Amino acid sequence: MPSNRSVRYEQDVVIIWQDTRFANMGYQIFFQFLNSDGSIDLEPNGRPVTLSTGANQSNPAAAVLSDDSIVLAWVDARDENPNIYLQHLDANGNRLWGDYGIPLTESIPIEQKNPRVSYKADQNQVYISWSNYESHSGNLRFYVYGQMIQNEQKQWGPDGIKISYYPEEEFLYHECSQNELKENYFTWQDANLIEFTQSIFTKKVDANGQTAQGWPESGLQVSTYPI
């Protein structure tokens, strides 16, 4: 589970991490702006991405936008089940999406994990991906979901869209975990529960949330050799 991130910010760096400085409140996520000369811009011990406390915050992911603002995603246990929350920070470190952040989805699945954030600068699009634990025909599985945010608005509905796709009769035989995200290219690890193999798949998705022209609906298997 990644506990820290660093992303480029102008000529400087944004450091994002989780720590337990308040042991009775669980892990919390903090950030700091680090200048090229080694100086810092914010409080000496960093600034929290949310004022929510008392439940673990983990697995931070972030991307810097063209206006030097930052979109972050993390796993937050404040609700009954671990779910992903979002925050938008301006170039001065101010919280733009409220002091407590906003939930990634309106629905509350059993679990969300593996958040990833990427920015497509030429279209001013923020892409987010994650693993969603849900019931399919009475069986619980992880599948990969995605969301695109543009002009502060979710473009793929309140709960995003399912990225990892299989024919109806095959859904039960696969489980997927989000791996990497680069702009609108989603990469995940697929576990075949019948063959007991694991493979890496990649899929390009257009701005409407549809599989990009020329790409298979189920994604492109990067290698035919199991991992």
Give the positions of each predicted feature.
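Extracellular, repeat-based ectodomains that mediate carbohydrate processing or recognition
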Residues: M1-I227
